[in-house]
Regions:
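Active-site neighborhoods of divalent-metal-dependent phosphate/nucleic-acid chemistry enzymes
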Residues: 71-115
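Histidine- and aromatic-rich ligand-binding microenvironments
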Residues: 3-6, 37-39, 93-95, 116, ...
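Acidic, PIN/NYN-like endoribonuclease modules and their adjacent C-terminal/linker elements
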Residues: 1, 101, 105-135
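Short, well-structured N-terminal submotif of metal-dependent ribonuclease cores
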Residues: 1-37, 50-62, 126-127
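A general alpha-helix detector
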Residues: 9, 44-45, 64, 82
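Structured helix-beta-strand junction loops
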Residues: 30-34, 67-68, 89
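Alpha-helix/helix-capping structural signal
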Residues: 8-9, 40, 78, 118
Length: 135
């Protein structure tokens, strides 16, 4: 099974003071699934890490991604088409979360690792009744 990983999870893993840190760390320690990070998540995580935790935290994240600790999923043209559909239907959902929905549908992934329960719980997917949100 594969899991798409959202920004909040990656940030929480790095920030020991984050409210989600412990739960996220415990989940990450136990998960055996393929972790897929949409390419659209990378700049968002990098920005948060650099602005809140500093350059060293951002560098550590980039190095772990470069080392293959997660799989990076590219954005495809069809994802952008679906992304626009999601953004039109759900105006509160922004670009990054919309691309996660589009990639989940394209890859037929039902599980999303996220701290953003509100957005992903409201989306009606084309391939599953509801996303399984972890941790």
């Amino acid at each position: 099974m594969a899991v798409l990983v959202d920004t909040g999870i990656l940030y929480a893993l790095a920030d020991e003071d984050d409210a989600w840190h412990e739960r996220t760390r415990d989940w990450a320690d136990d998960v055996n699934d393929l972790l897929i990070v949409p390419v659209t998540v990378l700049p968002e995580v990098s920005y948060l890490l650099h602005s809140r935790l500093g350059a060293a935290a951002e560098l550590a994240f980039v190095q772990s991604a470069a080392a293959g600790e997660v799989e990076i999923e590219p954005l495809r043209q069809q994802d952008l088409t679906r992304c626009a559909d999601v953004m039109r239907r759900y105006p509160d959902i922004g670009f990054v979360d919309s691309t996660i929905v589009a990639m989940a549908e394209r890859l037929t992934i039902e599980t999303i690792a996220t701290t953003d329960r509100r957005h992903f719980a409201m989306v009606k997917s084309r391939h599953t009744k509801a996303y399984q949100l972890v941790p």
